[in-house]
Amino acid sequence: MFEAGRIRTLWELVEYRARASYGMPMFHDGDGRSVTFGGVRDEALRVAAGFRELGIGAGTRVAWQLPTRIETVVASLALARLGAVQTPVIPLHREREVGFILAESAAEFVLVPGVWRGFDHTAMVRRLAGDGVRVLPVGDGLPMADPAGLPVWDPDGLPAGAPVGSGATTWIYYTSGTTSSPKGVEHTDATLLAGGIGLATALGMSADDIGSIAFPYAHVAGPDYVIAMLVSGFPAVILDSFEPGHAAAVYRRHGVTMAGGSTAFYQAFLDESRRYRQRLPRAGRLIPSLRLLSGGGAPMPPELYAAAGRELDCAIVHGYGMTECPMITMGTPYDSDEQLSRTVGKPVVGAQVRILLPDGSEAGTGESGEVTLKGAMLFRRYTDPALTAAAFAPDGSFRTGDLGYLRPDGHLVLTGRLKDIIIRKGENISAQEIEELVRTHPAVAEAAVIGLPDQERGERVCAVVTPADPAAPPLTLEGLTAHLRSAGLMTQKLPEQLETVGELPRGGPLNKVLKASLRERFTA
């Protein structure tokens, strides 16, 4: 039986699961390889010994830009065994982001995959890395040595010589930086453990389940998900890229019971299922074993919840988290359809959510304000002390910058971002509220609502949409505003400008809409 209080570090959890489930599968990949929990532990020990021979030890700052593979998980666990400070970097990041992260994190070593998907990561990082930074291409295999040479563990569960103790920073993640420079977010093993335990508890995963990782493992959700696997003892299919048809085929082969990653995955599986049934009308469900589709990272329109749930014939549970706190709330398989489609669930075990009004007082039930939180899964600090000072309220709670309210049933509803507010003639307007209604128009596939500078109003409301049917007559502003009026949207919130694009610009590991790019494009 797993006892959270006895596990203080990621490596302790690896050892716990290896003892409990040594010969049970932990990973299956898209190339037909499988490895057990015990095999991952043993491999990580050999790699840790190899890293140590290269000079990596407790407190060494190691950045890695590696694809989502079994070897990447092994490398990160090996670094955890050594007590290194890890900085994962999304594989799609290029010179601008990577250069900033390497310099800001003061990386001493950088692990890269060599040439991956036609791009030479080794050459890029060698151009960017400062003097004294060692670049280690690991495309042909991780360094290995005899684990007998590793330092013994002290009573606190960290390698001898590790700095500070179990509360030391061991992970530095960088926000996607879609609106500004990336922020360095410092986590400890303990904060990530708390998030992973919250995820495992909310979803009720067990050793009978088979999960999936098709999103970047370098995202903070990667180790969080692996922690949930280690806590509950379930295996997962791991893919180094996500293509819906290929992913669905691999999931069918292995009997995956839980899939997901973000709202974009819901839409991708919905579209793939429709194509699948068109090709094979008698084939049945896209993934017959699937019982849960879960994710977060972006709003989930209720109509997408309904359509994907019907098409895939499974429960859809959406959550809320961020780099600073990867697991805040999560829906559960036991919630009602109304709760799952209209909220982001209840706070997970250990998370304390409060809603603050602009004057700093606590909002009442159903009253909207800024979402603030405390909990064991909350990051330690930003690498920039000024950002840290600005991010916390006087009572020590973290200001998320998100707007929302708590319902009487304890579920959280997100209504927008503090910085995603359009100020029109002095009135604050939530872009998310309008987006949700714009998406209900039958001519609209996707929508983003932005504020544009306006001499008379301060800002005007602009809706940017992609057409559901590109061959159909284009949607007009008059047609859209009539639809929004019929949906009950007040006149002051109606869009004053409509733009139609082939696709919305997206970026970051969760494929979020780049609103700054849209504002720049459509500002007159």
What are the residue ranges of the model-derived segments?
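Conserved AMP-binding/adenylate-forming core of the ANL superfamily
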Residues: 6-7, 23-69, 73-77, 94-99, ...
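Conserved ATP/PPi-binding loop(s) of AMP-dependent carboxylate-activating enzymes
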Residues: 346-350, 361-391, 429
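Conserved beta-loop-beta connector loops within the AMP-binding
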Residues: 340, 352-372, 408-409, 470-477, ...
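Structural core segment of the AMP-binding/adenylate-forming
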Residues: 54, 84-148
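Conserved AMP-binding/adenylation subdomain of ANL enzymes
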Residues: 193-210, 218-260, 267-268, 272-279
